[in-house]
């Protein structure tokens, strides 16, 4: 089935003049393909997709797109990718949507070749996440991001490389800016919106608005037609991706308002020092959060790049470089019920993953919404959630081969690609540094309702209950009150 939904009204945003190379053809690659076809002019005879598995090869065969059934590895990436990315004239585009592909090495290669590049995570080569010889600090996303930042500082400028631009990390950084502008307006603050490149101005506005922290607050209510059997891991997006990040240490951007740190909390000795990590797996760490549909909920403090990049971006420093303000920032993720059950089984078996991994596609799911937004809290209006409430039904109508979760990612990849084509020599950028308005303009047709909600909920609501708790009643929005212990 080719893209039956391609109608004349979808805008074509630009032309990719060189070859297109997509690394990975799992749930996100499959969903991104029709969006690339719909919104860009490109030479299909110079598009190549690489994946070690050929599960969905027929989608490529019917389009006449070349498929290479091979994993991109540390040993073969230069030899494998260089001819594909330099095939014919024009500027190529490398779209990395795979696990176990060393992002920083691929960025370096693309910049050397003058090729545009985008990914959804700073991904290491195979073996990093489960390296028993490595200490936990070196298995963090903080360490991965620092490697990317070093590359950026060592070699500024050059062909645009968009780092970590999916739904989250990625889109949520654009939501944070829109939410901040909405909040500052509703608070009646006198302000003019900072320019895209004015990081300091954005940080000062966040401080002025009195925001103590930000949850990337998500609830996935997509349900399957049939119940999950035992000994399989079901998820609405990459199972390998979820397991690897779920078994990394929990990580959070660490705000200046925090008065208490868990005993197993650890600071970093080098770099921005914008984040801390806990000596426990993120997918087995719960926090109290809030989304519009369920209201109060438990979320998982799974590590994500945006928890670090957003906290870093909105840091206010003195002239001497001393940190004067920083918001706490972390993921608070309630995945689909089947994924929660899968995690429960996995951690029950001491973290041993189930032998069968399966991504639930749009045909196996019956209904539900992926409600993904940012919760700005601790200000004079208490808390404000702003985000996408995309339903499975709407995702099915908008584009083929994806559920609601996938579409929030693929549409962010699309927006990042558009921005890169329009700004081809920006060097390495994170989503926080891009033009959030332009990116959301491109992405919003795929996001369902994008709305803001104020709430009077705090993590101290209905607490303590029947049992004594260690709470900080002077400030409801302390991490002490948010972390489930």
Curated annotation (Swiss-Prot):
Chain segments annotated as coiled-coil in the UniProt record: none
Entry cofactors: NAD(+)
EC class: transferase
Superkingdom per UniProt: Bacteria
InterPro entries, sorted: Homospermid_syn-like_C, Sacchrp_dh-like_C, Sacchrp_dh_NADP-bd
One Gene Ontology term of the molecular function aspect: homospermidine synthase activity
Gene3D superfamilies for the chain: homospermidine synthase like, NAD(P)-binding Rossmann-like Domain
Catalytic activity entry: 2 putrescine = sym-homospermidine + NH4(+); putrescine + spermidine = sym-homospermidine + propane-1,3-diamine
Keywords: NAD, Transferase
UniProt-listed Enzyme Commission number(s): 2.5.1.44
Free-text function comment from the UniProt entry: Involved in the NAD(+)-dependent synthesis of the polyamine homospermidine from putrescine.
Family classification: Belongs to the saccharopine dehydrogenase family.
Name of the molecule in the record: Homospermidine synthase
Protein source organism: Mesorhizobium japonicum (strain LMG 29417 / CECT 9101 / MAFF 303099)
């Amino acid at each position: 089935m080719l893209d039956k939904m391609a109608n004349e009204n979808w805008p074509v945003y630009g032309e990719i003049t060189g070859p297109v190379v997509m690394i990975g053809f799992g749930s996100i690659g499959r969903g991104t393909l029709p969006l690339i076809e719909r919104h860009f002019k490109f030479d299909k005879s110079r598009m190549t997709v690489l994946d070690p598995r050929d599960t969905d090869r027929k989608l490529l065969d019917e389009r006449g797109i070349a498929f290479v059934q091979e994993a991109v590895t540390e040993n073969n990436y230069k030899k494998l990718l260089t001819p594909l990315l330099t095939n014919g004239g024009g500027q190529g585009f490398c779209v990395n949507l795979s696990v176990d592909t060393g992002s920083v090495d691929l960025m370096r290669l693309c910049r050397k070749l003058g090729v545009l590049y985008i990914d959804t995570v700073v991904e290491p080569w195979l073996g990093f996440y489960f390296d028993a010889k490595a200490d936990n600090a070196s298995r963090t996303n903080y360490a991965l991001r620092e490697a990317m930042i070093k590359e950026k500082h060592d070699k500024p400028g050059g062909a645009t490389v968009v780092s970590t631009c999916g739904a989250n990390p990625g889109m949520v950084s654009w939501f944070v800016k829109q939410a901040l502008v909405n909040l500052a307006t509703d608070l009646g603050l006198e302000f003019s919106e900072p320019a895209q490149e004015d990081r300091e101005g954005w940080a000062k506005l966040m401080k002025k608005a009195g925001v103590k922290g930000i949850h990337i607050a998500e609830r996935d209510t997509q349900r399957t037609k049939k119940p999950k059997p035992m000994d399989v891991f079901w998820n609405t997006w990459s199972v390998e991706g979820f397991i690897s990040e779920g078994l990394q240490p929990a990580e959070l951007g660490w705000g200046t308002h925090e008065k208490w740190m868990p005993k197993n909390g650890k600071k970093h000795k080098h770099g921005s020092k914008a984040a801390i990590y806990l000596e426990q797996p993120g997918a087995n760490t719960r926090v109290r959060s809030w989304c519009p549909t369920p209201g109060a909920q438990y979320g998982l403090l799974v590590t994500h790049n945006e928890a670090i990049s957003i906290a870093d971006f909105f840091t206010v420093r003195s002239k001497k470089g001393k940190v004067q303000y920083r918001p706490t920032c972390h993921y608070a993720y309630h995945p689909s019920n089947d994924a929660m059950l899968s995690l429960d089984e996995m951690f029950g078996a001491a973290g041993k993953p189930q032998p069968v991994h399966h991504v639930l596609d749009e045909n196996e799911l019956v209904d539900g919404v992926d409600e993904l937004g940012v919760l700005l809290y601790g200000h004079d209006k208490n808390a404000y959630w702003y985000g996408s409430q995309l339903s499975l039904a709407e995702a099915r109508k908008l584009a083929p081969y994806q559920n609601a979760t996938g579409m929030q990612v693929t549409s962010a990849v699309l927006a990042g690609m558009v921005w890169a084509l329009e700004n081809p020599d920006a060097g390495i950028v994170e989503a926080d540094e891009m033009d959030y308005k332009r990116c959301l303009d491109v992405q919003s047709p795929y996001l369902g309702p994008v709305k803001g909600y104020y709430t009077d909920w705090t993590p101290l609501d209905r607490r303590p209950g029947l049992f004594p708790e260690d709470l900080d009643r002077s400030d409801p929005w302390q991490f002490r009150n948010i972390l489930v212990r």
